[in-house]
Amino acid sequence: MGDSILFTVKNEHMALITLNRPQAANALSAEMLRNLQMIIQEIEFNSNIRCVILTGTGEKAFCAGADLKERIKLKEDQVLESVSLIQRTAALLDALPQPVIAAINGSALGGGLELALACDLRIATEAAVLGLPETGLAIIPGAGGTQRLPRLIGRGKAKEFIYTGRRVTAHEAKEIGLVEHVTAPCDLMPKAEELAAAISANGPIAVRQAKFAINKGLETDLATGLAIEQKAYEQTIPTKDRREGLQAFQEKRRAVYKGI
């Protein structure tokens, strides 16, 4: 698999994926994206993993987006395939049943920000800079940026963001709802792991169904969304974890969930 992507499982239920090309600002090469896809697919079918953290090596860059040194050598038809590779990777990340936290350790630009947008939650260091600068290169965001960003921060803000290609600081990103938390660099991973641990402590079937209901519900009208919510709720009723939650409440102890 090479070392462009690092993958570890921490504390049994927490997966950590690290983009590991610091010499290239963790830019997304084709090899790196294929490796990332393999890891995402491995996580998808591992019911023991309850939460995922995605971060980058170093303090300068989370991910600079597409590898432009690689891109400049491509023919026109190859460029589209290169963009599609990033888009498919982001889609796989978005579709994971487990919640994914982007721990943005530095600049997140272009396809790098689009990967973060495919995550459920985003935490950024104070020094991070975020942007979709593609229009400045006479192209557009092609890995979900034009679709996920307006769903997250609203149509008007997303249009300004993409049309101008301007970059925002971590604090401004928090103000507009692009990230949930901003930390000092030394606190980034502790905060991400704290959040992942809080998620992992809850009923894993319930968390997966909550993610499913939220994501699918946002794609449709309210009435259909409420029906999706009810179907998701039904999945939790016959579980042993639901009974464990009630028993733990009655006995005034912390519930121990097993995902069954």
Swiss-Prot record:
Lyase as UniProt keyword: yes
One GO biological process term: fatty acid beta-oxidation
Family per similarity comment: Belongs to the enoyl-CoA hydratase/isomerase family.
GO molecular function: lyase activity
Record protein name field: Putative enoyl-CoA hydratase/isomerase YngF
Annotated Gene3D superfamilies: 2-enoyl-CoA Hydratase, Chain A, domain 1, Lyase 2-enoyl-coa Hydratase, Chain A, domain 2
Intrachain disulfide bonds: none
Protein's organism: Bacillus subtilis (strain 168)
Keywords from the UniProt entry: Lyase
